[in-house]
Amino acid sequence: MIYQMQMPAKIEVDETTHTDYFGRFVAQPLERGYGVTLGNMMRRVLLASLPGTAITGIKVDGVFHEFSAIEGVREDVPEIVLNLKKVRFRSTCKRSCKTTLTITGPKDFTAGDIVAMEGEFDVLNKDLHIATVNEGSTLNIDVFVGRGRGYTPAEDNRPESMPIGYIAIDAIYTPIRNVKVAVENTRVGQRTDYEKMVLDVETDGSITPDDSISLAGRIINEHVAFFADFSPTEEEFTEEEFKQQDDEFEAMRKLLNTKIEDLDLSVRSHNCLRLAEIDSIGDLVSRKEDELLNYKNFGKKSLTELKEQLEKFELKFGMDITKYQMKG
């Protein structure tokens, strides 16, 4: 049997903090445990699976290995490599590309000096310092830019036909700077054990927070679909059964919304329920028997009459009907 579960009506966006770089998204209500489950899933996919652009390697004239110093440049190669890892791109290229730079001193070489030869990419953090070229010196450097997902170590960024002096770099492709997940309790009806998930997403500007969670959600959905399509036997979990469960759920919701005056009750019972502001069957079954007996003029005879009416619909007092309530 397939049970209806509490689901958020929509993802809420905190407009007071929303920018092109930061977004706070709220999903509620969720069943207990699902805040952590969905939050961790989104966090992992956002950080590790979104595509992006990064520098994958460099080649510097006169340099043959990554632990060299460069004549006329204040920083050594390892320090320059560390700075190049921080360069962030907005890119339209779907393949690796190379740009050749000639930096003549005196010059503060920044990320903004890295310009695509055919406009394949734009640098976002143009003020990022890369190196200082002294007066009378020239830095000739080839910068190789690639497209990928998540993170790739330097050893995986060495091409088969690697030119002499090529230095591979750890590529941080992910456009996501940080993801935080917070889970809190939230109330639905009389129950307080449902969960609210708050997802904070910070990007590098190459993708908006809204687009990033949408893309992460699609990636997750594509993978989970394999399990949704899996069936141990042909007879189990057919489309007809899913439809039957949906029909039963809607029928129950309609029944619970039925007005009390539509029931075949005595005038005394009708008046007691009206004074107690119990207007629908849903209002009635959500009450407990001892609660009803505390209402004025409501006795055991009226209680018995109501129980007989509810039994006709296979209902009883003290039911939890929160999952049938309309969200809005």
UniProtKB/Swiss-Prot annotation:
SMART domains: RPOLD. It catalyses: RNA(n) + a ribonucleoside 5'-triphosphate = RNA(n+1) + diphosphate. GO terms for cellular component: cytoplasm; DNA-directed RNA polymerase complex. GO terms for biological process: DNA-templated transcription. InterPro entries: DNA-dir_RNA_pol_insert (IPR011262), DNA-dir_RNA_pol_RpoA/D/Rpb3 (IPR011263), DNA-dir_RpoA (IPR011773), RBP11-like (IPR036603), RNAP_asu_C (IPR011260), RNApol_insert_sf (IPR036643). CDD domains: RNAP_alpha_NTD. Its EC number is 2.7.7.6. It comes from the Bacteria. One of its GO terms (molecular function) is DNA binding. Residues 1-231 are annotated as: Alpha N-terminal domain (alpha-NTD). It holds the Pfam family RNA_pol_L. Belongs to the RNA polymerase alpha chain family. The N-terminal domain is essential for RNAP assembly and basal transcription, whereas the C-terminal domain is involved in interaction with transcriptional regulators and with upstream promoter elements. Homodimer. The RNAP catalytic core consists of 2 alpha, 1 beta, 1 beta' and 1 omega subunit. When a sigma factor is associated with the core the holoenzyme is formed, which can initiate transcription. This is DNA-directed RNA polymerase subunit alpha. It comes from Chlorobium phaeovibrioides (strain DSM 265 / 1930). The gene is rpoA.
